[in-house]
């Protein structure tokens, strides 16, 4: 049994704290006598709200300080939204467990319209996700996409102030904050393929901390882990971050895994899609194979062009 106080690093946002308390409850259900201390941290990404993530370095900005807390032994584990965790894990750290996934899909939130199809021509839709932007423009090129940053409550407040006709958010984030009533449409994956790992919570720790690894491995949800492992393999092969419009979504059912992947241009003019179906234990191989297929079909040119443009902005 782990006989020390378990220190949990977490972002300070309402959603991050809600997710951390969810994990805390799971841990205490297994080890009721364990003493737990939360270590709230403000990340670099939390402080920069006037620029899109694609222009300031990507989702890794939300985890860097949490990982530093682990490396400096100021925390024992860190809680992440899996969609924010880069596909290449920092050396000396590892992903201990992934909790059971919630709803992985995106949702439309609007005060006046019930679906994307109902949005009028010229409607302003708020999102700073290049992945969502790319797919939405392809489906509805007559809409206006406007940047939207901040935590979920802040984004909804901007919608309510009339700055947007609709906004797009992660469904599970709304569910966790008990804002399910604000969802007007859960967007099908065929229209908006989710981000890698979306809807799941990951637990990260030091690679050498064997005792923590052992007792927290019990929180791992194997089906979710298999699904997200396939998604992350796809993105890892593409060396992707949120600076690039990429989606990946795997579903495991009856020992078969169905993996879908997408690479697009930010303006929505080019979208490449593919899928694989295979045995549950071939998810990682499927992810690499699907990425290779899209790279050969034109994704390599899209990614190269985006990397060149980004290098000019640094």
Curated annotation (Swiss-Prot):
Where on the chain is S-(dipyrrolylmethanemethyl)cysteine found, per UniProt? 242
Query: Encoded by which gene?
Result: hemC
Looking at its record, which EC class is this enzyme? transferase
Q: What PANTHER family does the annotation carry?
A: PORPHOBILINOGEN DEAMINASE
Assembly, per entry: Monomer.
Q: Please state which protein family the record places this protein in.
A: Belongs to the HMBS family.
**Which interval of the chain is the signal sequence?**
none
A Gene Ontology molecular function term of the record: hydroxymethylbilane synthase activity
Q: What does this protein do?
A: Tetrapolymerization of the monopyrrole PBG into the hydroxymethylbilane pre-uroporphyrinogen in several discrete steps.
Q: In which pathway does it act?
A: Porphyrin-containing compound metabolism; protoporphyrin-IX biosynthesis; coproporphyrinogen-III from 5-aminolevulinate: step 2/4
CDD domains, alphabetically?
PBP2_EcHMBS_like (cd13646)
Q: Which metal ions or organic cofactors does this protein require, according to UniProt?
A: dipyrromethane
Q: Under which name does UniProt file this protein?
A: Porphobilinogen deaminase
Q: What GO terms fall under cellular component here?
A: cytoplasm
Q: Which reaction does it catalyse?
A: 4 porphobilinogen + H2O = hydroxymethylbilane + 4 NH4(+)
The source organism is Buchnera aphidicola subsp. Acyrthosiphon pisum (strain APS) (Acyrthosiphon pisum symbiotic bacterium)
The UniProt keywords, alphabetically, are: Porphyrin biosynthesis, Transferase
Q: Give the EC number(s) listed in the UniProt record.
A: 2.5.1.61
Q: What else is known?
A: The porphobilinogen subunits are added to the dipyrromethane group.
